[in-house]
């Protein structure tokens, strides 16, 4: 195996940065007035994290009313636990090791299986960049299948399935029995477009999870070499998830930046992370990320394979790509984007497009097909890819290499031809019991978004859909987190299981930490809006709690319950910075005399007073009649 012919220049301070890599990057996760809570499963080592936001009391003329804590889904892992000791150089605790050992269908390999992995492990030039706590990789024993889909089809409920059932339920079954939550748990009926959305938290059971996985409608991306993972589920009949991208490039960003960006993404709520690195030290960057990631990590293996050829697509080979798959699988990558649906005969269909082929992976494979005038080797070797995937339980994210790059190209012949091929490949992967999700567009005008979901459900047999947006207009560079967030909320409502975030830098440059924050918050909004629209149990709880806090002028609770407490408070404090303003019954928008909510409260107080006066008069009238109705005695 040869080393890459070209690599980007890296910072001369990389080694020093790694040596100084802060142990407290994650300790800064001090969510305001929040508490980390663990929900206990059927065994001691199933401890499912959530965050509870504590609220202040409400003070009224009638006395004090306690407001209960609000549970929220938490992706921050140990970084959100104030009691945890975090050392990025040591990696995260291995919470799944006992589960893997007990199943008895994997083995610890004596060494790495990938030629390139072995080469990197013994290269003295990368010694200063290596994560030093690497353990030997696992692989399925000969004849064994270790995927969550395989277990589900055998009727087995794994600890991972129980974990995600508890996580999705968010103890709402318990709260629904408590009177203080009765009003807060009220919500509008959703429209699910035929999805099998649970109607009550009690229905979100480990058996329900198993059934959804067995049917192929959901996946738990959980590589057996990622024991640090806190399991999560991606499926139409569960909470809508979001993915955050990171990765260095040939022109900018360093290894340490990507590790910090990953941790930063978790703080704001990324459910999964895709490492899209295309620059130097891809292998080492990925190792640091996975060892410190409590969420699933996805990659596009063709990017690294291309780096190994010096960026020459024509030089790609099946053997090189196969070695890259094994290399990444043994590091612990949980899902691979594989552009196996870009077929030779589809490439000419893109000739009349306004923007042609915009997917990096799609363009790489299209160029290879044309250069060799042969069928895509990812398609012709698909069964062999499945054999690798099921040996490590890596999930497919079947790539949309022919997705539209502008709304003019949306829903065209080439896009849907590829989608239909992805359905064919889904069926083939399922015969190997390999988990599958389907990637989708892209750029689609709003009126044509639903058609994408309909086509995917029909031709890909309800495998989870994973979409990039879609962007519903092309006129807003710098604001594409908004143009795509609009499409994302809609397609999430229609049934998309996971939304890939878009940052303000889309089409313009590599995002920095603030861009990542903005992208994730925007997509948390879109996913939550979709959950509300499809009627996910308890989805409206946080909305109701925040609305109540707003009406009662509990400013601090408004900040705490928001998706971005820091930004909400900073915007408030720009005009009313005094501490007393946080208990004032008005804001700078209307002022004290014109606040609609303050006026409404005064009207209610007046009405209550009038009601009391009327009641008093009525009582006096009754007393007067009882005494004989005489004016003078």
From Swiss-Prot:
Catalytic activity: 5-amino-1-(5-phospho-beta-D-ribosyl)imidazole + S-adenosyl-L-methionine = 4-amino-2-methyl-5-(phosphooxymethyl)pyrimidine + CO + 5'-deoxyadenosine + formate + L-methionine + 3 H(+)
Reported cofactor(s): [4Fe-4S] cluster
Cysteines joined through disulfide linkages: none
Cofactor note: Binds 1 [4Fe-4S] cluster per subunit. The cluster is coordinated with 3 cysteines and an exchangeable S-adenosyl-L-methionine.
Any one GO CC term of the record: cytosol
Signal peptide: none
Enzyme Commission identifier(s): 4.1.99.17
InterPro entries: ThiC, ThiC-associated_dom, ThiC/Bza_core_dom, ThiC/BzaA/B
Sequence positions that bind substrate: 245, 274, 303, 339, 359-361, 400-403, 439, 466
Keywords: 4Fe-4S, Iron, Iron-sulfur, Lyase, Metal-binding, S-adenosyl-L-methionine, Thiamine biosynthesis, Zinc
Pfam family, one: ThiC_Rad_SAM
A Gene Ontology molecular function term of the record: zinc ion binding
Pathway the protein acts in: Cofactor biosynthesis; thiamine diphosphate biosynthesis
Quaternary structure and interacting proteins, as annotated: Homodimer.
Family: Belongs to the ThiC family.
Its job: Catalyzes the synthesis of the hydroxymethylpyrimidine phosphate (HMP-P) moiety of thiamine from aminoimidazole ribotide (AIR) in a radical S-adenosyl-L-methionine (SAM)-dependent reaction.
Protein name: Phosphomethylpyrimidine synthase
Taxonomic lineage from the root: Bacteria, Pseudomonadati, Pseudomonadota, Betaproteobacteria, Neisseriales
